[in-house]
């Protein structure tokens, strides 16, 4: 059975209008497909704090035509110390940008989503659309919604995050908690940051924290602590956080003094990790956190979702002119197989608890900073499909992304 000639466009149904869903929709619309994005929330306002855009994610954003100039804050270094002030490592982000072709940016999530939605056709997004069921037959997929309506298409992409309904209905294994959680958010402190391009991470015996400039006077803060399913939220979360982290550094104390319980209202965010799923079924697949939720240890979640977009768009672009249902299924399985090894590598690294142990990380102080920088650069190279990315950029007539200030 033929699905539809590509010159007439595949009808793609995307469940979830976060960064993963909108980035994929941008790529598929660019390639001439007929895309509709369904979101259960009444609007697309992004919550949370900021995200780190590494070179691999920046390259995909460039391919999608997303203008990131002036968004957030580019970083020149990440300094890692212990809670007693001992220097462990400094990552040279400027050197990494030279080696990888794009700067590292800390960008508020709301700003990233705004940039993704620039020039995005509003009629392609349907809010207040809560999907409750999916099904697939030979040559067609269907999504059912809680208002009794349904919609049909040629393929379905689950981009609906950690608690993905689409993932549940594909029988993929559920996410498991790692035993840690983050209390996090953004704060505006004009008098705090001496160098707005330097991020700070501090590792202690029983927790860690980060203070990362996110553009203007905004600062992304997070405090990581152990977590379990029987966690009882304290009456004053900020009191607990201050008790754990006060005295770690002058900037930390300044942030702790500025925060209130209201700033912690949405926290904590427990860390989960999905087992990377096996092959999907038929014309249904997953991207982003719906596919591979991982702890924020390496700040790769958003970037890996963007790489999902790149590889999935490539898979569909390589379909024959009049693809059969089997052709489409093979393209989706190719996408899943191509991503699986690299996503699994990132997931394994993020699951390590080394970053939460001052004792384990003390030997890092004896390793030259240039080797820390080199190691992170090589890691990003290894998980980024750089050859494919370069070919796609050339095909789109894009020059290499070069580091920019700001």
Predicted regions and their residues:
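C-terminal helical "tail/cap" subdomain of flavin- and related membrane-associated enzymes
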Residues: 2-10, 298-299, 314-406
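Conserved N-terminal helical subregion
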Residues: 2-12, 29, 54-170, 174-186, ...
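Conserved mid-domain beta->alpha element of the FAD-binding
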Residues: 15-42, 157-158, 183, 261-356
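N-terminal polybasic phosphate/anion-binding patch
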Residues: 44-46
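Short beta-strand micro-motifs enriched in acidic
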Residues: 136-137, 212-216
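Short beta-strand motif preference
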Residues: 143, 210-211, 220-221, 286-287
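Flavin-dependent oxidoreductases
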Residues: 180-212
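FAD/FMN-dependent oxidoreductases across multiple families
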Residues: 205, 214-217, 225-304
């Amino acid at each position: 059975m033929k699905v539809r000639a590509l010159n007439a466009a595949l009808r793609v149904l995307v469940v979830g209008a976060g960064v993963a869903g909108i980035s994929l929709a941008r790529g598929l619309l660019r390639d001439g497909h007929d895309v509709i994005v369904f979101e259960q929330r009444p609007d697309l306002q992004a919550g949370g704090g900021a995200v780190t855009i590494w070179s691999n994610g920046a390259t995909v954003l460039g391919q999608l035509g997303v203008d990131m100039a002036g968004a957030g804050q580019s970083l020149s270094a990440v300094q890692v110390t212990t809670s007693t002030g001992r220097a462990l490592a400094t990552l040279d982000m400027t050197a990494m940008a030279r080696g990888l072709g794009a700067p590292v940016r800390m960008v508020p999530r709301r700003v990233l989503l705004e940039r993704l939605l620039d020039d995005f056709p509003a009629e392609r997004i349907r809010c207040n659309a809560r999907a409750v069921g999916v099904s697939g037959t030979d040559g067609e997929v269907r999504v059912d919604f809680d208002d009794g309506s349904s919609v049909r298409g040629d393929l379905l992409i689950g981009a609906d995050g950690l608690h993905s309904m689409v993932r549940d209905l594909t029988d993929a294994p559920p996410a498991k908690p790692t035993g840690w959680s983050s209390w996090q958010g953004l704060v505006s402190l004009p008098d705090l940051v001496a160098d707005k391009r330097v991020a700070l991470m501090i590792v202690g015996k029983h927790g860690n924290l980060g203070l990362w400039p996110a553009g203007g006077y905004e600062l992304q803060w997070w405090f990581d602590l152990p977590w379990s399913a029987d966690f009882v939220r304290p009456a004053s979360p900020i009191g607990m956080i201050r008790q754990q982290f006060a005295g770690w550094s002058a900037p930390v104390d300044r942030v702790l003094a500025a925060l209130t319980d209201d700033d912690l209202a949405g926290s904590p965010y427990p860390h989960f990790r999905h087992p990377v799923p096996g092959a999907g079924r038929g014309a249904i697949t997953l991207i982003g956190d719906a596919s591979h939720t991982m702890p924020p240890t390496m700040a790769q979640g958003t970037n890996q979702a963007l790489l999902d977009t790149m590889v999935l768009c490539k898979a569909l672009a390589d379909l024959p002119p009049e693809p059969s249902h089997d052709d489409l299924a093979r393209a989706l399985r190719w996408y899943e197989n191509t991503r699986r090894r690299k996503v699994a590598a990132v997931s394994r690294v993020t699951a390590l608890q080394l970053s939460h142990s001052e004792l384990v990380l003390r030997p890092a102080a004896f390793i030259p900073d240039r080797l820390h920088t080199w190691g992170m650069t090589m890691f990003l190279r290894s998980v980024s499909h750089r050859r494919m990315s370069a070919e796609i950029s050339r095909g789109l007539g894009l020059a290499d992304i070069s580091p920019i200030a700001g």
